[in-house]
C-alpha cells in the first residue's frame, strides 16, 4: 500500500519564507534557470495541435502537454516516469511543469531594458551622467559614443554625429574607439568601477559650490550607492538574453470553429524571435551596416514592447487595432495581477441572493434559503450521510443530495447547527460590512436579514443583494464566531457608540408607547405595583398613554416609591434590564434616547444583556408601531396661518434693501447678501412657526375649556421621534421650500415661496430641478472620489498595528474642550474618554488625584474630571508613541468597538482608514435627499452674552468712534464674561472693526448685545482723526470707478496696477497738513489691497474709528461635503493651499520696510535675536498693523494655513492638532462622529519620515528622506562609535507619497506607479520583510495582525496530562478536538489580553 503512494508526488510544502528580495538578474543566471532556448516563433501545429519543436510552446523545453506522456506517444503512463524520450526529447512528467519552466532567447545583439531606460528618472542615463535624450540617440543608432578617446581631442562619453565621426575617423583613424547602439552603452557601463565612483562623487558633493550642482551629484550618488549596496552590476541593465514565460501562463486556447484565442504575450515574443532570427541571418550574410542597424533598432523596439508596450513611441497593436498587453500591463492598475488576483480573489463556498427583512430572527441569526444551504454545505452533508450510514460512498451521497431525499434535509439541519456563515454587502466600506450569523433554514430563495444590522451594512430591502461565505476550518469558525458575530459588534469602531440601534418603525413604536396623552382614560390613577398596572392595562381600564403613578423602585437596590409615569413606560420597563435606572426610560423615547439606552445598557449590564435588550426593543417597537396605526394624509401638513404675514414682511424688507441699493448706499454684493439673509431668516421663521403649529394641538378638556397639548400629528411624530424625515423636509411640505442653489453653487435670490402641499408653479419647479439634478450627478462623482480616498488611507495606514503593551513614552498631547465662537462644540470628557492619562490629574480645588498617570480614563473618571471643572488634561497619544514599528496599546487607549483596552495585534491603521473613509462615501450619497434646497445659516453679525456677569476686555485695543462706541482695532481681541467670583463663564473672539456695545467692567444680563459687525466686508479703519489724502490712487491705473448698471451710481474700487511702483494708500494729515502720527509713532498710512472699495473721499475730515475702505468678502456658497471631501483629501495629501498665508516664524513686533519688486516687506523683530523679513505680494491685505505684538505661527496676511509651515514653525503636535481639528470640522458639519484617534493614526503615518539636513558620519546623504526609527537607529550606532550623528527635520508626506515610500516595495507596487516602484526596488536589491498586512496578503501568508501576530503564531500549548487514563479516544476525533482547543485557547488568550 505504501508503495502506491510513493508513485504520486506529494504536494511540496509551501516554502516557509519571511522576506522577499528583488534584484537584477545576470545573463548567466537567466540561462542557468532556463530549460532551453526558444529558437522559432512557431506555436503549435495547426493540424495535429501539438507544439512545434523549439517553438514558443515546445514540449522539449517546457514539458509535456499531457500528464506522463511524451510528444510522439512512445512513452505513456506512470511507469515511464522521469524518462526522456530519445525520439522527441520530451521528459515524461506531469504537465503542470509547463506552468513553472522558463525558456530563454539569446539575442543577437544587446538591448536596453526599457524600465531602466524610460522609467523616470532614467537609471541608465543617471549612472552614465548623460541625459536621457543622449542615451536614446546612442541606443537608436543616431549618434556614436566615445568609449576610449586615446590621444585625440575627444573625451570619454562624448557623442559624435555621423558626419563628425567620419571627419574624426579620417584624421585619427585607429586612435580612438566610438560605437553606437546598446553595445556601446553596455561597454560604457562595464567600465564603471562603482566603489571608486562612489568615493569620487561623495568628494564632489562636499566640494559642490552651488545647490543645483549638489542636488545633481546627490541624485547620481543615490543610484551608485544602490548598486554598491545591492551587489547588482550596472551592465545587467542591458539585456543579452531574455527569459521566456512558461507557456501555461500565456496560454493558446482553441476556440470552436478552428480559431485560437491567445495571450498577447505570444504575439510580442513572436515578434522578438522573428526579428532576432532575421538579425542573426543578416549578420551571417555580412549585410550592409545600414540594414543591420535598422534591424537592431527594430529588435530593441520589439523587446521594449514585450516589457512595456507603449512606453516608447506608438504601442504595437494586434489585428483588432487594440494595443497588446505587455508584461508591465499585466501587473499595473485595477485589472493587473496585484489588485485583481492577489489582493482581491473570488472564493468558493459562497453564494449571493436578494435580501428580505426577517423581523422574527434573533440578532445572531440570518435566514438562509434551503437551496443555498444545500449547495454551500455539500461536503459536510456527504460526510454526515456516510457517518450516519445512509450511504456508503461519496457517489451515492451525491445522488441522495441531488434527489433531495428527506434524510438529506435532516442531516442539513444538523450540519448547519452552530456553524456560522458570513454575510457581506458590497460596497464593504468598513469592517461591519461583513458580519457573521448563525443560519436558520427558510423556504424561498431570498436571504433574510435581521433589521437591526441594516445600519451597519447600509442595507435596505429595495432589491439589495448580499453574498454568503462559509468558513470551513474549525479555527476560522471560531474566529468568525468570536470576532465577527453580529452580537459581538454592537459598538461602532469609528466612534464607540452603539451601531445596533432600532430605527424607523421600531423607533416610532417606542416613541408612541412612551408619549403622554392628555385626559386619557385612567389618568391620575395610582397603582400599587407593575403587576397591577399590567392587569389594569389588559383589562382596558387605563390607556397606553395615560399619566399615572406606580409604586416601584426607581433603580436597582433603591426602596420603592411612587413614580409619576405613563402606562407605556412601565410596560417598557419590563423589557429593559433592572440594572438600568428608570430615569432612562421615563421620557419620551426618541431615537437619541433609544441609542443612549443601548449605550448605557452595554456599560452597565454587559454585552449579552444588550443583545437581548436590542431584540426585545425590536419586537416591542414593531408591536406598538402596528398598534399605533400611524399614517400620512394631506391634512397632516398644516400650513401656519402666519405664513403670509411673514412673507409680506420679508418682501417689504427686500424692497427696502433694493431702495438703499438704488440710492447707492450699499454695493450690489452687499445687497445680494442681505437679500439672501432676509429670505433665509424668513424661511427659518416660517419653518419654526409651522413646527410649533404641528407640535401643539388644541383640545377641549373635560371641564370644557380649550387647552394646548403636545400633538399626535403623524408627520410631526415621525420627525420628532427621529424615525423618518427631518425638520428640513417638513419645512418643504408645509412651510416654504426656501432658497435654491444654481448648479454653480450660488444661491438664487428669489426663493420658492410655495410648499409641496400648495404645489409649485412652472418656474418654481424649473428652479428646483437644478438642485435635484446636481444632487444625483454629485453622488455619482463623489462615490468614486470617496472610494479612492479610502483606498489611499488604507494603504498608508495598513502597517499600523498594535505591537506592544506600553512603549513607556513620557510625551503626550494636551486635550481641551473644543470651542467655537464661545460655544462648546465638543466637551473635554468626550475627547478624552477611552484614552490614557499621561500624568496624574489633580482636582484644582482639593488637590486630590482623580486619575493616576497611565490609567485609562473611563466614563466614571470622565464624570469626576468634568465635575471638578478641569479645563485641560494631558493624555498619551498615538502621535507621541515611541514604538519603533506599530503602536503601543497604552498610547492608543480603548478599542472603541469592544469598550476595553485595545488587544495586541489589532490592525488599528485599517480601522482608522475605514472610519474616516466610510462616512465620506455615506455623505456623498446623501446630498440629494433634501432635494437641493440651499441650506445656509444666516451669517453671525453680533454677539450676545449667554450668562449674567461682568464684561472684561482681553488683549483688546479700541478707539471711540463718532457715536461714542468702542471700535476694535486689533486682531485676536477677546471679550469675556466673568461672574462675581471672577471665574470666567464665557469668552468670545471679536473681529477687527466690531463695535462694542458695552464698556469694560460693566454688568451684563444674559441675552444682551455685546458687539456687532458687518459679516460681508472687512473694514480698514482709522485710529485717529484727520484729513483724508489719497496716494497713488489714479483713475484707470490703480483705481477704477465702477458704475453700477442698476443704480447709475459709481464707487471707487482698487484694481491691480500695471506698474510695480504704484502703491494705492490713504494718508491722514493733521491740522498743519503734515502726515499724522499713530499712537505708536508710525505715520498714519493705510495701504489698500486689490478689490477694496474706497469709502472715504479726498479731503474729508474723519474721526477715530471711521471706515476708510471696505474689502468685500466672498459671497457665500452653500456648504455641502463637496467642499468637504476635497478638503479632507487636501489635508491628508498635505497639499499647499492655493493662496496660503505667510506666517511669522518668531514672536516679535511688526514693522514695515521699503517695498521691493512689487512686494511689501514686513519685519518681525524679537526681543532678543535677529529680526526676520517677509515679502508679501502686493494687493494682498496684510492683517497685522505696525507695532503689533505677534506670536510665532500667526498669519501676517489673509489666506489659509499651509500645513508644512505649521510643522516647521510650531512643530508636530501643533500640526497634528491643526489637521485633526480641520478634518473633524468637515465631518462635524455633516453630523458625522469620528474619534480623534483615528485621524491621529493617519497623521502619525504621514509624519513617519525625516529629511536629513546634515548627514554627519552616517550613511545617509543630505536631503535623503528616511524612516524615523531608521534615522534614530543609525544615529545611536554612529554616536556609539564616536562619530557625529545626522541632523534631520520632521517631514510631512501626503498619504499617496507616504504609501509609495513605505519600506515594503510589494505594498507600494500594488498601490500606484507599479513600474517605478519595482524598478527602484530591483536596483537597490530591496528586501521586503513582509511586516505590513498588504504584502502578506499578496504573498499568500497569514497577516501579522489579530491571531496571526507572531506572538500567537509561535505559541505552544502545554496540556496537563490527567491522572487516570480513561477510555481511548478514536484517533480522528482527537485531531479535531485538539485543533479546536488550540484555536479556542488562542481566541481566549486574545480576549484575556484585553481584560487585564
Curated annotation (Swiss-Prot):
It catalyses: RNA(n) + a ribonucleoside 5'-triphosphate = RNA(n+1) + diphosphate. It comes from the Bacteria. Zn(2+) 1 binds at residues 70, 72, 85, 88. Residues 1361-1378 have a biased composition (Acidic residues). GO terms for biological process: DNA-templated transcription. It is an enzyme of class 2 (transferase). Mg(2+) binds at residues 460, 462, 464. The keyword Transferase applies. The RNAP catalytic core consists of 2 alpha, 1 beta, 1 beta' and 1 omega subunit. When a sigma factor is associated with the core the holoenzyme is formed, which can initiate transcription. NCBIfam families: rpoC_TIGR. This is DNA-directed RNA polymerase subunit beta'. The gene is rpoC.
